[in-house]
Amino acid sequence: MTQQPLPTRTEEISPTRKSTPWSRYEEAVLGFRNYWYPAMLSRHLRRKPVAVQLLGEKLVFVRSQGKCYALENRCPHRGVPLSMGTCEFPGTHTITCRYHGWTFDLSDGLCVAAITDGPESSIVGKVRVSSYPVEERKGLIWVFIGDRQPPPFEEDVPEDILDEKAVLGIRLTQRIGNWRLA
């Protein structure tokens, strides 16, 4: 059995060709998106929304009644970061944009109110921001920003991390640069 040599450049991979060991790497312009990623320490998410940028995505994390949520950090109305917003209506699992009061459901990103437009607003139920699956484990908040259904968390994260007896040493650093060269 003979093996074909691997292509040396992305352009040489035809769309009809089966994947190569490097295909996923070459296609991952902004990183490997279809995985669970640790986004922040659980203790850093309290009452106020927190902005995080991960793999080129600007996210906002919100804790509502003890549960964590992640949304796109951009109000579709004027582009204001939702991380500047507030949870105006306790118990409703929503975040409200500070600029014009558009309010989004934390579970699915759907606009549920437009405070400045009143209860008859035509945008309610029609506009949404992206929402992302979140898991909180071992003192970390994990997020899946892929373009498909997330795999079960336990199957995607190394089992050593989930071991109850394991102690995680965590260091936070911000890296700006090309992830492929890191």
Kindly label every feature range from the protein language model.
Residues 179-181:
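Glycine-rich, aromatic-lined ligand/substrate-binding cores of catalytic
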